[in-house]
């Protein structure tokens, strides 16, 4: 089967999320819409039709999907869901079946062709602009009852021989020709649509796990499962960490009910960035003290000799490897000076500045590893109504070392949320206003904790320059972990800003 994804159009219903990228690159539940679609068809020939922000789409596919058989088709002046379809059909063999679908659909499984000229997929899961009635007539009526969702399988390209260069596939060509076709209707329940800006923002706010995990909440317990065997080792590292710190009587964790099912006590509490308007400055200081004291308690449980190679892997190799992955997506990457929100900053990845950057990284040495959490951002601990701190989702490893690592990294990750507003980037509460080959302008929603920077530095007992440098590396590393285009740009800018505070 050949897969044709209609990814044209500006996606204006998604507001700021499509200002700088086509809608197929919008993230949903940890993956871009495009990634979700092509992963269902990894052994098929895939054509992606694009127009808006075409260079971004082209570079993105080259960066992240080089292992797939993908061809991108740029429409030339044509509009509507038919635009680019004729161009794609010219590249398909006469007898091959075809899947044609819109890029903003989220399908939790493959679609298969049934013997017919055309199979029209309908759904009752969300509102569609057109529906298919019992006589297989296309009715212009906003409906969630047999709504035409924007996915079709076609026997072969000869069925589509009369499609025009532009216009609407559903209300135009299909409606005009449906009486001449052998049509099958298939209603499916495993389809979702991204929809509008408010729906997408709600999704970002309510996401509780990464795409390879599932979290099930019961009244008094939480069960965590790995959905992808490739990531099972992360769950194993997490279990190992809980066992070790529990054995050493660390109190600031939920009780583990079962390691086999990975079921733990449910802690009722709040994340710091979600309660910022309800807590006074004095309360925030007291809560930050308790978080800091809990980290000190964790770090004091046990120590081992540090691994120099692990330090190099985490601070140097991971940073440079991840930037290498996405550098072609960053339009200002090659600029020696980058104007960020109206101020000029030196770019440490410019060849003339890289040696100085590397020298700073190489000085990040330590003789001792402590037991660490590895990722104590706001999302990974809860504050109860009694202002107790409970950590969860530990990293469980520091490169090759399990459970132990550089305690400075924990403090840097806390700074990442408190001062860096990482959680606003993670939840897409930001906007990239403009960018070009030498500049970027962005706005980032505050978590309301930045004023406690000096208090946090003092609490950590770590040199401020070291925490800033580690945060610089964390933001740069985050670039290569991300798949959201705007987040990549902002994360790189944040890394550059931090570097210029210490260089």
Where are the model-predicted features located?
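N-terminal glycine-rich phosphate-binding loop and ensuing alpha1 helix
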Residues: 1-58
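Conserved beta-loop-beta/alpha segment of the NTase-like Rossmann-fold superfamily
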Residues: 57-58, 62-134
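Catalytic-core segments of class I nucleotidyltransferases/pyrophosphorylases
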Residues: 132-205
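ATP-binding glycine-rich loop module of kinase domains
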Residues: 211-243, 265, 273-280
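Conserved kinase catalytic-core helix
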Residues: 243-250, 273-326, 332-337, 350-365, ...
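Conserved HxN/HPN-centered segment at the entrance to the catalytic loop
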Residues: 246-261
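Active-site acidic catalytic loop and adjacent metal/ATP-binding pocket
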Residues: 358-405
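Active-site activation/catalytic loop segments of kinase-like enzymes and analogous catalytic loops
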Residues: 397-456, 472-487
């Amino acid at each position: 089967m050949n897969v044709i994804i209609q990814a044209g159009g500006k996606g204006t219903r998604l507001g700021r999320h499509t200002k700088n990228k086509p809608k197929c690159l919008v993230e949903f539940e940890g993956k871009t819409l495009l990634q979700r679609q092509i992963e269902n068809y990894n052994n098929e020939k895939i054509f992606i039709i694009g127009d808006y922000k075409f260079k971004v789409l082209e570079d993105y596919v080259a960066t992240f999907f080089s292992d797939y058989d993908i061809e991108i088709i740029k429409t030339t002046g044509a509009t509507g869901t038919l635009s680019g379809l004729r161009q794609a059909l010219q590249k398909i063999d006469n007898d091959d079946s075809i899947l044609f679908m819109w890029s903003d659909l989220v399908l939790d499984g493959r679609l298969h062709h049934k013997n017919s000229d055309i199979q029209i997929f309908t759904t009752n899961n969300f509102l569609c602009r057109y529906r298919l009635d019992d006589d297989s007539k296309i009715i212009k009526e906003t409906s969630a009852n047999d709504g035409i969702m924007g996915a079709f399988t076609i026997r072969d390209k000869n069925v589509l021989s009369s499609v025009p260069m532009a216009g609407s596939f559903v209300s135009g060509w299909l409606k005009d020709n449906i009486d001449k076709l052998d049509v099958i209707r298939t209603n499916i329940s495993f389809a979702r649509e991204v929809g509008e800006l408010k729906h997408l923002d709600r999704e970002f706010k309510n996401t509780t796990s990464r795409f390879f995990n599932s979290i099930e909440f019961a009244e008094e317990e939480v069960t965590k499962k790995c959905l992808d065997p490739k990531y099972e080792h992360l769950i194993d590292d997490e279990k190992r960490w809980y066992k070790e710190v529990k054995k050493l009587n660390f109190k600031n964790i939920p009780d583990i009910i079962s390691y086999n099912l990975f079921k733990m006590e449910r802690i009722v509490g709040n994340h710091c960035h979600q309660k910022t308007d309800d807590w006074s400055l004095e309360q925030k200081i007291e809560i930050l003290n308790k978080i800091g004291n809990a980290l000190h308690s964790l770090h004091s449980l046990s120590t081992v000799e540090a691994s120099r190679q692990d330090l190099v892997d985490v601070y140097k190799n991971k940073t440079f490897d991840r930037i290498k992955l996405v550098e072609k997506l960053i339009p200002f990457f090659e600029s020696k000076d980058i104007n960020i929100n109206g101020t000029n900053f030196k770019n440490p990845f410019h060849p003339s500045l890289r040696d100085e950057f590397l020298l700073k990284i190489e000085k990040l040495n330590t003789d001792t590893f402590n037991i660490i959490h590895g990722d104590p951002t706001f999302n990974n601990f809860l504050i109860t109504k009694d202002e107790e701190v409970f950590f969860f989702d530990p990293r469980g490893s520091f490169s090759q070392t399990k459970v132990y690592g550089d305690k400075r990294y924990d403090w840097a990750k806390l700074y990442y949320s408190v001062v860096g507003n990482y959680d606003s980037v993670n939840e897409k509460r930001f906007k990239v206003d403009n960018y070009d080959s030498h500049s970027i302008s962005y706005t980032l929603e505050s978590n309301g904790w930045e004023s406690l920077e000096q208090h946090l530095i003092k609490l950590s007992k770590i040199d401020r320059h070291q925490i800033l440098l580690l945060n610089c590396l964390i933001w740069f590393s985050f670039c290569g972990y991300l798949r959201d285009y705007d987040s990549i740009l902002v994360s790189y800018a944040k890394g550059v800003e931090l570097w210029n505070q210490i260089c």
